[in-house]
From Swiss-Prot:
GO terms for cellular component: cytoplasm; nucleoid. This is Curved DNA-binding protein. Its main location: cytoplasm. The lineage of its organism: Bacteria, Pseudomonadati, Pseudomonadota, Gammaproteobacteria, Enterobacterales. One of its GO terms (molecular function) is unfolded protein binding. It comes from Escherichia coli O157:H7.
Length: 306
């Protein structure tokens, strides 16, 4: 299995700090998100970037990855044992030696009982939009084959067509019975576990079953009220901005959050007041008229008060 260069994927250096990596991640997430990008490999690139961020954003996982990367070209000595003369031997050699010393009966007596196969976990990236309905997904993974010493001798590529149910959440585990490694001596197969990773979205943040989206509004829209078009996971809606709205105010849109078997969350629009560019002479005069009309208003009146 090839070890990916996550730093190259993110376009950063191994010495870069988390802030630099986070900036690169946000830029690439916006660039390759399927809702925005027109590049044919956008979805694959987006998932690759999300995978890299998942590792590099965690201090412990990043340290472990750096150590693995440093030793990626080291010989895999753990797959073989060495005789005194330096020649390697495998499990069959070990059995032959055991039989020659203790006899065939002893060899048969050391046969292990039936044992269940190993479970396998793989991470599956899912877009927020995909959580709304059940969808099919083709997944590929490597099925390890163990030798008599419990060590991996080879990996067999395997592909499955699976159903991802509606309402899956981040970190949720889906069990595919019997799709793990084969059991030993007639034992049952292990299972395959799909661990759901909800890919970060350029517009929405997840808060439990709810979603949050930052909605930019002009000062006059906040002051006078307005109707603005806001995207949701399914379609765009017309959101009413009440007169006198404040920056950071949260407006609830019922039933437009995440869907699960038990409930449907809401969408919260968080208002962000955006000032226009530096005013020209006429615009500045209008702002001054507003300031004169509201001369008694002090936005810092309660500043610092409990």
């Amino acid at each position: 299995m090839e070890l990916k260069d996550y730093y190259a994927i993110m376009g950063v250096k191994p010495t870069d700090d988390l802030k630099t990596i986070k900036t690169a991640y946000r830029r690439l997430a916006r660039k390759y998100h399927p809702d925005v990008s027109k590049e044919p490999d956008a979805e694959a690139r987006f998932k690759e970037v999300a995978e890299a961020w998942e590792v590099l954003s965690d201090e412990q996982r990043r340290a472990e990855y750096d150590q693995m990367w440093q030793h990626r070209n080291d010989p895999q000595f753990s797959r073989q044992f060495q005789h005194g003369d330096g020649q390697s031997f495998n499990a069959e050699d070990f059995d032959d030696i055991f039989s020659s010393i203790f006899g065939q009966h002893a060899r048969q007596s050391r046969q292990r009982p039936a044992a269940r196969g190993h479970d396998i976990e793989i991470e599956v990236a899912v877009f927020l939009e995909e959580t709304l309905t059940e969808h099919k997904r083709t997944i590929s993974y490597n099925l390890p084959v163990y030798n008599a010493f419990g060590m991996i001798e080879q990996e067999i590529p395997k592909t499955l067509n699976v159903k991802i149910p509606a309402g899956v959440g981040n970190g949720q585990r889906i069990r595919l019975k019997g799709q793990g490694t084969p059991g030993e001596n007639g034992g049952p197969n292990g299972d395959l576990w799909l661990v759901i990773h909800i890919a970060p979205h350029p517009l929405f943040d997840i808060v439990g079953q709810d979603l949050e989206i930052v909605v930019p509004v002009s000062p006059w829209e906040a002051a006078l009220g307005a109707k603005v078009t806001v995207p949701t996971l399914k379609e765009s809606i017309l959101l009413t901005i009440p007169p006198g709205s404040q920056a950071g105010q949260r407006l609830r849109v019922k039933g437009k959050g995440l869907v699960s078997k038990k409930q449907t969350g809401d969408l919260y629009a968080v208002l962000k007041i955006v000032m226009p560019p530096k005013p020209d002479e006429n615009t500045a005069a209008l702002w001054q008229q507003l300031a004169d009309a509201q001369s008694s208003f002090d936005p810092r009146k309660d500043w610092g008060k409990a």
